[in-house]
Structures are given as C-alpha cells and as structure tokens.
C-alpha cells in the first residue's frame, strides 16, 4: 500500500492510496464463487451455477461492495500509519487505476490540536444562597394559589382575580389575526398578556364595556405586531375572586403528606427547594466557567462535527412538536448552527481538560448524581435500580460526572469570588435563562 497525504484547507486532509489491484480481483472472484454455490437459479442445479452467470447477474454489485470494503480497510490502515485522527466519515473517490494498482482518494477532516490557554484568567463570580423560612412560606403561598377555587363576585376586578372577557383587537381601525376571543379566562396579575392589558381590565365590573390601548413589545413573536399600538374593545362578562385554602395539616394532605402534617410538608418543600438551588448554583458556575474557557481559547472546528450536531439539535427540536412534526417543513440548519458550534467547541476543549488532568468518572459521584435525580421521584430506589441496569444511561451519567470533574479542575486555576444572592431572585433569573 502506498499513501500520500495532502493538506487541502484548514482541517481537511486528502489521502491518495494505492493498493495492488489483485486485492480487489481476488476478493471479487472469491465472492462470485461463493455466490455460485449458494445461488438458486432456474435451469441450474443447486451449487452448479456457472460463475460466468453469477458474474453477469451480480458481478457489478459484488465489485462495488468489494471495492468499498477494500477502500475502507486500507483507509483505516493508512490513518493509523500516518497518525491521523479523523473527525467524521471520509468520502471515497476512485482514482487512476491500471491492471496492477487500484488507486482511490479519501477526503476527510481531522480533529484540531487543542492547546489550552488562559485558564488562570477565567473569572467566576460564585453565587451562594440558602433556603430560608421566608422562602418556604413564599412557596406555600404559591401552592395555595395553585389550589385556589373561584366564585363570581359583583365588585370590580382586582389583581389575583379571574376575569371572563370578550375582546376584539384592532390596529389603525383594522382587526388583526389572533386578536379576537370570546369568554376568554384571564388571570389578572399573571403577566401572561402584553403589558397594560391585565391592568386595563382591573377596576371594571361585570357587564361593563370599555377599550384598552396597549403597545406590543418590540420583541413580540408576531413580526407584524412588533412595536404596534393596538386598541382592544373589551366586554367584561364575569369577575371571579379566589378562595385560598387554609394552611394547616389538611392542606398538607393535598400534596401526599400522610404523616407529620404541615411541618412535614414544610420540611419536604425546603428539601426540594434546596436540591433545586444546589443544581441552579452549579449550573450557574458551570456556565461561567465554560464561557471563560471559550473566550480564552480559539480553535478551528471540523465542519463535519458541526453538521452532525446540527442534525442532533434539529431532531430534538422536531420531537418537541410531537405529532405536529409530521406536517412541518424541515427546520433550517441556520437555526441551530450557533448552538452546534458552541457544543462542539465546548466538547473539544473539555476533552482536552479531561485528557490533561487524566480524569476518569468517579463512581461515587456517578451514584450521587443518580441518587439526587431519583430523589425527585415517588420511588427513588426503583429509579436507581433502573439506571444501574441500563448501560447506556449509566454511560450518559458517567459523562455528566466527568464533565463536572472537568469544570471543577478549571475552577482550581480560575479567579473565583463569592457573592451572596437572594434565593427567589436567583431562582427566577435561573428559570428565565434556562
């Protein structure tokens, strides 16, 4: 086998490989003979079909298969000999060949050489926080509202009420698509409608008809409505006031607390909030570390890896549409390119961190991650058992653990300062960013 290596551009490499033509001819002849023994063709006894007949029927397909196998096998031998690390599958193109030699060209990208830089310049503001009794009380108040019952009242609508309304929206006197509804149930104070809409309903009583003027935000999802001033003609059909359940032992039973009453519920809420806080704090630090790592290190990215990641992200996005995905056009790659590039770059850089620090997934950490995740389920032991019995899921969890260890290794050399943060403000911000 003769091999020549050519750098075409960037990370792309081109191998020209020449092998004895006899390799292919012998393999083709052997395959034809084997097929002749197995073939069942009318007019011939089993195992007695002439090779010439098999060649006429299947020779072209057999030669293509053998040629592909020879190219793949010799390509692998060539990249090992030349110490090349391909990123993605190669493309094979047959080259100039004669009776003695078969030549082909393999084109592919290689992984970039990664040399970590500026790790000591990564700046991280590490947030610290605790779940207080006041935070637990706030959560209980939220749960009360979620379990509220509503009844019609004759007073003016106020924050926290539900209002059933008819509305017709118009811009410059013309109605617009999606701006009309009847008997629409509006939760006042929820912030789900555009600014000014909910507050415009407050203060009015059932039976009143009135207009509200609002401005659509510049970042509104409908392009034709961004920044536009709209008038909504409102008919208020009914105002409903909330009746909140009392916070007592009976309230605790609504959440499956059979023993311990209200105090047990508070303890469970505090535990869950603490777990969520810990996850959010770790995610925040990880994001800062990765952003710093990316800022300090510029590397060339294999286009094949980006394309592969785009496909993964595209499939994930389509899955979120469920049954509707079948009737949707394919989402354009541009939607995912930036995210794909980030994921590929992070993967390559963290891979080098893992290699440099000789990291291996700590089994104790892996089990801790599984236990933490399982604690959110009704039967944690069942979830732990399921994970431990599934090799693919265990490998995924080991990858998570290894990534955590890599981030911790980077933190050791980073410039870290601590900052105390309010639980509610921090979690609200984390939810918005997530």
Swiss-Prot record:
One of its GO terms (biological process) is protein transport. It holds the Pfam family Trigger_N. Its main location: cytoplasm. GO terms for molecular function: peptidyl-prolyl cis-trans isomerase activity; protein folding chaperone; ribosome binding. It catalyses: [protein]-peptidylproline (omega=180) = [protein]-peptidylproline (omega=0). Belongs to the FKBP-type PPIase family. Tig subfamily. The gene is tig. It is an enzyme of class 5 (isomerase). Coiled coil: none annotated. Residues 160-245 form the PPIase FKBP-type domain. Involved in protein export. Acts as a chaperone by maintaining the newly synthesized protein in an open conformation. Functions as a peptidyl-prolyl cis-trans isomerase. PANTHER family: TRIGGER FACTOR CHAPERONE AND PEPTIDYL-PROLYL CIS/TRANS ISOMERASE (PTHR30560), TRIGGER FACTOR-LIKE PROTEIN TIG, CHLOROPLASTIC (PTHR30560:SF3). NCBIfam families: tig (TIGR00115). This is Trigger factor. It is found in: Cytoplasm. InterPro entries: PPIase_dom_sf (IPR046357), PPIase_FKBP_dom (IPR001179), Trig_fac (IPR005215), Trigger_fac_C (IPR008880), Trigger_fac_C_sf (IPR037041), Trigger_fac_ribosome-bd_bac (IPR008881), Trigger_fac_ribosome-bd_sf (IPR036611), Trigger_fact/SurA_dom_sf (IPR027304). Its EC number is 5.2.1.8. One of its GO terms (cellular component) is cytoplasm. Consists of 3 domains; the N-terminus binds the ribosome, the middle domain has PPIase activity, while the C-terminus has intrinsic chaperone activity on its own. Disulfide bonds: none annotated. Keywords: Cell cycle, Cell division, Chaperone, Cytoplasm, Isomerase, Rotamase.
